[in-house]
């Protein structure tokens, strides 16, 4: 009866949620189900279906892949730049952002974006989903591919058995996809990337570290200014080396999953290549150093350009910069390790750098889009660069900042000194639109929107600049074949939406980047990988000629006109881009360098056959089998089922059973049902069977948008109760519903609310060992949280900012007419952190909390007093845990005192926490299992309050407690993918209760805990 009612309730909720997501649309063929968020995006369907079909057929033939399910694609416009993501767990799905790509430094190819996305993302799907005989057995046994669940860690083992190739490092997945994308697009890919060549050429030139496999994951992706991009760089480079050395066919054999293949990616590598992956990686590093030394010799055939550093270190990622003659400083956005992203001012003579304004939501590589008004001293810049960009302005003299337009979605800003207008390129709904803003920059006007699709020769634009007299607009156009053209357009024509003009120079397949006018308007300076190395080029407006003004060993970018005879440019280094001064004079010549990609192309002709033909025009009416509103429940069904082991109320009472997982395509709707049985005679007969069910809905459009969760259970068991000391399972039945959403994205503020009904409980739901005097009660809560904390590159925790929350909770106990009562509690928390200027990554946090219980007047003998109290004590971590590493930061733990041993109706708590810099392990372990980092935190807190339910002769009982503690955390990585954390803590506490008038020393507490799936 209980299970039937629970299932009926959850299904009814599911059908309700179906209608709430009705604004989503879907178009389905036999192979793909495309879900899109706006009817404005429907124009992309023919191109997407065509490129998907073309790429999918190629992958299936090359890898011998036979799909057992169709693929779901979510097509959305949640960010300003195009991007993609794919996963094969538990179902095959792809998520694509339809915006134009970010072409900065040619880190992305300029080929048609849907074609490129399908080449790349389908490689992920095919190489991770492809099963052999053993995988198919486990998928059949568990009724699907198993996703890991933090609630039941045994799912880790089941997930690996059903999809072993999913469990490989990111460099393996991204390197494979980049390798395939490059050949499928007929050499237009990052295997031929000049940026990639520059990165490793610079490492060899500077004799810098080229990480091994473990070091890349433990240090390279976290402390380097390029962070996660290193997975693409290293993965592409190593896989290209392996293919070049052993043959591209060996690569296909390695990433495929035939019946005789090994499950783990390193074991399969040894089987295919006959050498361990560690040895092959070492061989690649030796080869790389030799290859790049030869390239350096080619560059040095001609005199290299001398330079004078402007700063004493690399600045990580940098934006476009401006030199202000009034202050003698350059202004630009910077984003580098151990510092928060910011608008910075760098003194050209001294190199001293100071912060002008913080940048929230900085981007890797370009940081922010900027434009400068030298007369007013106003610098315009964008924030939230990973989503919908906002336009801000800061005065570089007063450092006063102001938000101009929220969600403008524009970048490539340029300031017209002639009429004070601001120009930019806005990305929306897959289109690029040139826009213009007039003072006070509160609204914009669309000048020209570039079309998208095969019928348009030019479909994207970037890199805008305006001549000093305002008569000429410079812009780069991109065509469907990935060719960039630097154009000069008379402003009189541009204002009318006519962007036909003069092509300045044919840079062949290399993109002209960051071209800016000199202050006198006679020249334009920019960079290009024309020779394979990024150098600075000068265009003479009068002579109509282009000459190279640098010959650099690494790469020069983002020129800033300084004087007639000098330029400031950004030189690539291992620490990022460093501003340097170079002479403004033509160089003798520059030499081309070699690319590994072309070596593969010439040495292994088979890759030339991997170039896909142009996607065919397709008649959607003939292949579409369904079109209309997207109904998540139409694809809702069983995703997997597997055995579980849990415990009920005591680690000594294990319970055995099964968990069933349900899911719709894309995971918008999820559900699970766990049924376990406790065979122990010590458990009452009516408590031996345990039920727990959950339904989760993510509604992304409409008035009900947000996250909804519905949970119900009876005598529910819990895996982590097998270990203690915190026990989560309770006797009794319950039904809860909760809802959360972000109500203000700018501040930001998140709202959460919930309702619950409980019956048969002997203990409070949230506090073990605290008796619920009456076993039937109702609860409700409403909370608001604010999170504005930031971390610097290379950190492992939030380092500065503020975190706040305010919550209201009420429990209604309908005991009887005389004692039924509402127990309401108010809780507020505020934390503030700052970086100490002693060493890098040394934050100090002040964490405060206060609570007040509205207990009323008659409370001295209330039998339900526990509902109105706050309880404190202990670290709270179990031996094996999942609820957070730093539990002591919450208001209710109190390391050094027993769990829930302290009770209060009103309290104030203050904690100080010092987080020491992390210790990173460059190579401790193997790709299968390794250590990532270790850190230590020191904390101390004071708790003072009163307990209105406990009286002394002088009134309510006053309590005072203090503690001091330390916690060490060690990050562990399993399967090259799964992160866990081993924590060791020690706390000492003392308490003062006024009825004893003495301080009481608690027994010191030691905590050891392994956090699963952190």
Predicted regions and their residues:
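Beta-strand C-termini and the immediately following turn/loop, strongest in propeller blades
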Residues: 311, 324-325, 331-338, 369-375, ...
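Feature captures outer-membrane beta-barrel proteins of Gram-negative bacteria and organelles
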Residues: 538, 656-664, 685-712, 727-745, ...
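Multi-bladed beta-propeller domains
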Residues: 295-316, 346-368, 383, 393-414, ...
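Juxtacatalytic substrate-recognition/specificity segment
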Residues: 22-163, 169, 221
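Acidic/His/Gly-enriched intrinsically disordered linker/tail segments
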Residues: 91, 113-117, 131-245, 249, ...
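Outer-membrane beta-barrel initiation region
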Residues: 301, 334, 341, 528, ...
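Beta/coil-rich, acidic/histidine-enriched accessory regions frequently appended to metallopeptidases
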Residues: 25-28, 53, 225-229, 253-378, ...
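C-terminal outer-membrane beta-barrel translocator/porin domains of Gram-negative envelope proteins
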Residues: 717-718, 725, 737, 766-938, ...
């Amino acid at each position: 009866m209980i299970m039937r009612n629970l299932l009926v309730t959850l299904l009814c909720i599911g059908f309700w949620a179906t209608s709430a997501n009705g604004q989503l649309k879907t178009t389905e063929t036999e192979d793909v189900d495309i879900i899109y968020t706006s009817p404005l995006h429907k124009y992309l369907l023919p191109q997407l279906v065509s490129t998907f079909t073309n790429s999918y057929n190629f992958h299936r033939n090359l890898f011998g892949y036979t799909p057992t399910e169709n693929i779901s694609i979510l097509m959305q416009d949640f960010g300003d730049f195009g991007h993609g993501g794919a996963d094969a767990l538990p179902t095959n799905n792809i998520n694509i952002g339809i915006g134009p790509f970010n072409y900065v430094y040619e880190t992305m190819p300029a080929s048609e974006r849907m074609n490129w996305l399908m080449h790349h993302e389908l490689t992920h799907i095919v190489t991770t989903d492809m099963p052999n005989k053993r995988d198919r057995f486990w998928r059949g046994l568990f009724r699907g591919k198993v996703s890991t669940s933090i609630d039941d860690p045994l799912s880790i083992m089941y997930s690996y058995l059903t999809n072993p190739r999913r469990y490989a490092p990111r460099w393996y997945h991204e390197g494979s996809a980049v390798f395939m994308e490059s050949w499928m697009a007929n050499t237009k890919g990052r295997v031929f990337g000049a940026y990639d060549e520059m990165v490793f050429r610079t490492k060899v030139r500077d004799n810098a570290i080229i990480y091994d496999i473990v070091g890349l994951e433990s240090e390279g992706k976290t402390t380097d200014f390029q962070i996660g991009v290193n997975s693409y760089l290293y993965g592409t480079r190593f896989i290209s080396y392996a293919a070049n050395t052993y043959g591209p066919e060996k690569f296909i054999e390695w990433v495929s999953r035939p019946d005789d293949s090994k499950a783990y990616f390193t074991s399969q590598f040894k089987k295919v290549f006959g050498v361990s992956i560690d040895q092959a990686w070492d061989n690649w590093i030796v080869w790389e150093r030799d290859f790049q030394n030869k390239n350096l010799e080619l560059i040095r055939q001609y005199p290299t350009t001398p330079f004078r550093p402007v700063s004493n270190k690399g600045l990580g990622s940098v934006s476009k910069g401006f030199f202000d003659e009034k202050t003698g400083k350059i202004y630009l956005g910077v984003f580098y390790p151990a510092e928060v992203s910011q608008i910075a001012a760098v003194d050209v003579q001294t190199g001293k750098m100071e912060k002008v304004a913080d940048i929230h939501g900085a981007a890797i590589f370009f940081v922010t889009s900027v434009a400068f008004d030298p007369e007013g001293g106003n610098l315009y810049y964008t924030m939230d660069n990973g989503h919908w960009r906002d336009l801000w302005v800061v005065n570089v003299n007063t450092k006063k900042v102001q938000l101009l337009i929220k969600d403008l979605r524009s970048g490539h800003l340029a300031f017209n000194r002639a009429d004070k207008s601001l120009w930019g390129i806005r990305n929306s709904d897959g289109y690029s639109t040139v826009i213009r803003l007039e003072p006070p920059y509160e609204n914009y006007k669309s000048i020209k929107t570039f079309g998208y699709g095969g019928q348009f020769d030019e479909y994207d634009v970037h890199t805008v600049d305006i001549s000093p007299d305002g008569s000429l607009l410079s812009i780069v156009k991109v065509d469907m074949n990935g060719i960039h053209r630097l154009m000069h357009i008379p402003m009189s024509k541009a204002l009318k939406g006519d962007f036909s003009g003069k092509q300045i120079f044919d840079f062949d397949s290399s993109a002209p980047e960051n071209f800016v006018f000199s202050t006198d308007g006679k020249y334009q300076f920019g960079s290009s990988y024309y020779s394979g190395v990024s150098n600075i080029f000068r265009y003479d407006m009068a002579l109509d000629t282009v000459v190279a003004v640098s010959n650099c060993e690494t790469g020069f970018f983002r020129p800033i006109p300084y004087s007639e005879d000098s330029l400031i440019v950004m030189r690539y280094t291992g620490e990022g881009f460093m501003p340097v001064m170079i002479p403004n004079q033509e160089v003798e010549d520059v030499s081309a360098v070699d690319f590994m990609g072309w070596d593969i192309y010439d040495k292994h002709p088979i890759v030339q056959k991997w170039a896909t033909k142009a996607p065919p025009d397709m008649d959607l009416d003939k292949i579409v089998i369904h079109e209309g509103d997207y109904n998540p429940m139409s694809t809702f069904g069983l995703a997997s089922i597997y055995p579980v082991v849990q415990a009920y109320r005591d680690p000594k009472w294990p319970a055995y059973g099964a968990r069933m997982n349900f899911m719709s395509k894309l995971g918008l709707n999820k559900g699970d049902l766990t049924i376990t049985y406790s065979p122990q005679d010590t458990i009452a007969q009516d408590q031996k069977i345990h039920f727990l069910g959950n339904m989760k809905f993510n509604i992304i459009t409409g008035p009900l948008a947000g996250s909804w969760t519905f949970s119900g259970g009876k005598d529910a068991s819990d895996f982590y109760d097998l270990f203690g000391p915190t026990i989560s399972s309770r006797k009794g039945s319950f039904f809860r519903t909760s809802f959360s959403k972000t109500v203000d994205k700018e501040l930001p503020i998140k709202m959460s609310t919930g309702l619950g009904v409980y019956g048969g409980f002997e203990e409070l739901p949230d506090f073990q060992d605290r008796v619920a005097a009456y076993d039937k009660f109702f609860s409700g809560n409403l909370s608001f949280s604010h999170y504005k904390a930031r971390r610097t590159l290379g950190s492992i925790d939030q380092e500065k900012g503020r975190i706040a929350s305010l919550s209201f909770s009420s429990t209604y106990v309908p005991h009887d007419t005389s004692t039924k009562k509402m127990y309401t509690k108010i809780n507020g928390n505020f934390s503030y952190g700052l970086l100490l200027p002693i060493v890098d990554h040394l934050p100090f946090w002040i964490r405060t909390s206060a609570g007040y219980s509205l207990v009323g007047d008659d409370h001295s003998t209330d039998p339900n007093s526990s509902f109105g109290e706050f309880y404190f004590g202990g670290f709270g971590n179990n031996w094996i845990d999942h609820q957070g590493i730093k539990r002591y930061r919450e208001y209710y733990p109190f390391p050094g005192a027993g769990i829930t041993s302290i009770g209060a109706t009103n309290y104030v708590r203050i904690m100080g926490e010092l987080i020491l810099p992390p210790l990173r392990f460059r190579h401790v372990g193997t790709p299968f299992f390794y250590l990532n980092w270790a850190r230590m935190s020191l904390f101390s807190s004071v708790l003072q309050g009163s307990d209105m339910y406990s009286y002394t002769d002088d009134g309510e009982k006053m309590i005072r407690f203090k503690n001091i503690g330390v916690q060490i955390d060690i990050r562990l990585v399993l399967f090259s993918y799964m992160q866990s954390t081993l924590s060791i803590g020690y706390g000492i506490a003392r308490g003062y209760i006024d009825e004893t008038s003495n301080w009481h020393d608690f027994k010191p507490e030691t905590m050891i805990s392994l956090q699963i799936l952190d």
